[in-house]
């Protein structure tokens, strides 16, 4: 038993034939060793696809972690067991269909790291750093979540990950925390959502609290500080929102960040013309700040949740197309049957729109997918977010170097998508040039960009 387990700890998962050959034993001897090893091994696959791996402990705990899915009413249901394998992989033992598509290597549940549907649960960005800083001592992890290993991430998620993006929860402790929220909401004990009349006072206070958490300089890193909140929705139900905000001073850099928040709101308003869903947003100006309030599309009412996975997570696990365009992502997904052809075409239009919008930050994490409708491709484009002219973001958070808008004509293979996107981008620039929530100086930039794009259209 020991040679088998030690070998698998060093070498990672192995198929039966290769394992017997490398150990110099017969299949029958191997099967006896596997049975004797018992729970020290993780076994997945059937017949010739069977593979074996040594079980790995998480902070001294060798038991597998339950994975739960939260439904539209807020009720969690276990869908899988997550087994950790040596030296640094994992295996999903499905109790219900996962829903998210898997490539051939992952069909039996094997992953080289965390399963990709769990990758976006890891803390990241402004809110993720705030979470890490607040809980680092308790969790015994770095204050920088970018430095966390997969095991650090799983440890944090299993204890405190009850309210991450999407609809998945890992670990019994985190699930119990979610159930405490459910109980409080159903008993009428949860904090009441903000009323419309309260926003002008509440949002500046929440922004001050977010900045006081000790995370200054996020704009210097090219991102907006933000907070989450609940407010009364138009239908009377509680609505979860993500709120980005500008600084409160009147410096040129702060005014530019404010302008860009308004631009993001305006961009979302024209995307329907491209056949694309966009996150529902609005601008609130109060307390000397500009707030972009975005309705969370993975939350429904007080407790409901739905699944969400970024292209970055899917790409890293299944495609390896880092640094490629979203148009190429759409083609790759459609070629595998994971995305409908018309959705892939919509992604090509979105990519061209973003380029004509001067969005220089269309990375893999800024594109996400939902589960597709039953009977069709497994993926569907999630509402678009973070679409704004980042070319004009202040350098180092404060400086405003001159930036030149230079829209380009498309290559022949991109012409159809470009021709669909260009009039919509022109509409955006026209709206931005006329919107008085944007500073006069940047409205002038938008007006000049309108002229340049109109000239290119002919």
Which residues does each PLM region occupy?
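Phosphate/dinucleotide-binding and metal-coordinating scaffold of catalytic cores
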Residues: 2-458
């Amino acid at each position: 038993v020991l040679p088998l387990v030690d070998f698998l700890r060093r070498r990672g998962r192995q198929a039966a034939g290769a394992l017997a050959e490398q150990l110099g034993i017969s299949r029958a001897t191997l099967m006896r060793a596997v049975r004797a090893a018992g729970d020290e091994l993780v076994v997945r696959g059937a017949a010739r696809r069977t593979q074996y791996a040594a079980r790995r402990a998480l902070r001294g705990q060798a038991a597998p972690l339950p994975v739960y899915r939260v439904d539209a009413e807020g009720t969690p249901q276990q869908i899988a067991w997550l087994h950790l394998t040596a030296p640094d992989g994992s295996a999903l033992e499905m109790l219900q269909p996962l829903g998210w598509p898997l490539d051939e290597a992952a069909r039996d549940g094997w992953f080289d790291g965390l399963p990709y549907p769990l990758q976006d649960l890891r803390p990241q960005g402004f809110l993720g750093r705030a979470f890490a800083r607040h809980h680092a001592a308790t969790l015994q992890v770095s204050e920088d979540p970018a430095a966390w290993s997969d095991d650090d991430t799983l440890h944090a998620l299993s204890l405190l990950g009850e309210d991450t993006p999407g609809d998945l929860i890992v670990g019994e402790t985190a699930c119990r925390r979610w159930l405490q929220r459910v109980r409080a909401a159903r008993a009428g004990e949860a904090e009441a959502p903000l009323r419309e009349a309260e926003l002008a006072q509440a949002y500046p206070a929440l922004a001050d609290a977010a900045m006081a958490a000790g995370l200054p300089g996020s704009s210097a890193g090219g991102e907006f500080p933000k907070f989450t909140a609940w407010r009364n929705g138009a239908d009377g139900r509680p609505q979860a929102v993500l709120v980005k905000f500008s600084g409160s001073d009147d410096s040129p850099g702060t005014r530019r960040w404010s302008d860009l928040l308004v631009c993001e709101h305006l961009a979302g308003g024209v995307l329907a013309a491209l056949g694309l869903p966009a996150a529902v947003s609005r601008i609130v100006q109060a307390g000397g700040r500009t707030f972009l309030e975005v309705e969370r599309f993975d939350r429904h009412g007080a407790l409901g949740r739905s699944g969400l996975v970024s292209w970055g997570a899917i790409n890293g696990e299944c495609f390896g197309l880092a640094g490629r365009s979203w148009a190429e992502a759409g083609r790759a997904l459609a070629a595998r049957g994971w995305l409908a052809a018309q959705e892939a075409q919509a992604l090509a239009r979105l990519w061209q729109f973003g380029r004509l919008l001067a969005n220089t930050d269309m990375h893999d994490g800024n594109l996400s997918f939902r589960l597709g409708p039953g009977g069709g491709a497994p993926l569907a484009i999630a509402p678009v977010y973070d679409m704004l002219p980042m070319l004009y973001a202040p350098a180092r958070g404060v400086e405003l170097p001159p930036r030149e808008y230079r829209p380009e004509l498309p290559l022949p293979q991109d012409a159809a998508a470009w021709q669909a996107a260009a009039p919509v981008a022109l509409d955006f620039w026209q709206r931005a040039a006329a919107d008085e929530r944007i500073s006069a100086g940047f409205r002038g930039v938008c007006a000049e960009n309108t002229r340049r794009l109109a000239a290119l259209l002919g």
